[in-house]
């Protein structure tokens, strides 16, 4: 790679992530003593979840809706709980049984099955929520705005390649003084903090690992992972 490789700044990106071994400047490495390799592998998506949590600016006693209970949504949910949220609603398809169960385990007060009820029709305790964390497709941003109380914040992440244009009622945003905020993290910057949160027991990432597989089994393992909608959460490649 040349001498310039040693001069790269923190957070650099280059091909080699799936190599069995890689040479990386010591200044770019973060120790994860006291954690398993499986837990350490989740620090990248956890950094994404942390940026979403910070973008939402959750305050004490806020009511929070987590829209989408994949690994990032479930980690952000735990952070919202630790950050002082009064009540947490988690929205997900009823077919994603494992995700819904973990949402309950991590502190969700109510689970909303979005394939059975429209969010706009759900009876929220305060009529709506103060913050919405959107990890579902961006097209749901309009729905998120519709269930926000006055002064609410909708924070979202995710890239939509097929439907990047979203629609929402501008009057709802204007009259209710809502904010729509995008989250785009540089996860590596949060690695030390995320490691501390896991070690302190504030965020449980071990429960998110639903599948493990070795490198040589990647094609078949990933195919099975995508077929297993009921229990699939996070797949981690390991070396036995």
Question: Predicted segment positions?
Answer:
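Glycine-rich phosphate/adenylate-binding loop and adjacent beta-alpha elements
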Residues: 1-29
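Glycine/charged-rich beta-loop-alpha catalytic/anionic-binding loops adjacent to active sites
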Residues: 27-38, 176-177
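Structural detector of well-ordered beta-strand residues that form the stable sheet scaffold
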Residues: 30, 65, 89, 153-155, ...
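Mid-domain Rossmann-like dinucleotide-binding core that forms the NAD(H)/NADP(H) cofactor-binding site
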Residues: 35-116
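Glycine-rich cofactor phosphate-binding loops and adjacent beta1-alpha1 units
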Residues: 56, 60, 97, 101, ...
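Cofactor-binding loop segments of dinucleotide-utilizing enzymes, especially the Rossmann-like FAD-
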Residues: 69, 93, 159, 185, ...
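C-terminal hydrophobic helical "lid"/dimerization subdomain
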Residues: 142-146, 188-240
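Short strand-turn motif at the edge of the Rossmann-like AdoMet-binding core
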Residues: 158-161, 183-186, 213
């Amino acid at each position: 790679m040349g001498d310039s490789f040693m001069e790269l700044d923190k957070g650099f990106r280059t091909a080699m992530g799936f190599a069995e071994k890689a040479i990386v400047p010591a200044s770019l490495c973060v120790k994860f003593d006291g954690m398993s390799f499986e837990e350490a592998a989740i620090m990248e998506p956890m950094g994404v979840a942390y940026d979403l949590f910070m973008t939402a600016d959750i305050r004490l006693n806020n009511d929070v809706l987590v829209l989408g209970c994949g690994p990032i949504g479930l980690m952000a949910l735990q952070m919202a709980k630790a950050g002082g949220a009064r009540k947490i609603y988690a929205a997900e398809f009823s077919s994603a049984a494992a995700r819904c169960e973990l949402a309950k385990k991590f502190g969700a007060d109510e689970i909303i099955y979005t394939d059975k009820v429209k969010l706009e029709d759900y009876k929220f305790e305060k009529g709506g929520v103060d913050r919405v964390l959107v990890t579902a497709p961006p097209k749901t941003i309009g729905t998120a705005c519709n269930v926000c109380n006055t002064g609410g914040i909708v924070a979202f992440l995710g890239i939509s390649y097929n439907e990047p244009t979203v629609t929402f009622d501008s009057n709802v945003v204007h009259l209710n003084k809502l904010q729509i905020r995008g989250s785009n993290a540089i996860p590596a910057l949060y690695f030390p903090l995320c490691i501390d949160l896991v070690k302190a027991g504030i965020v449980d990432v071990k429960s998110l690992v639903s599948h493990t597989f070795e490198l040589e089994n990647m094609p078949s393992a990933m195919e099975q992972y995508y077929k297993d909608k009921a229990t699939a959460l996070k797949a981690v490649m390991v070396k036995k």
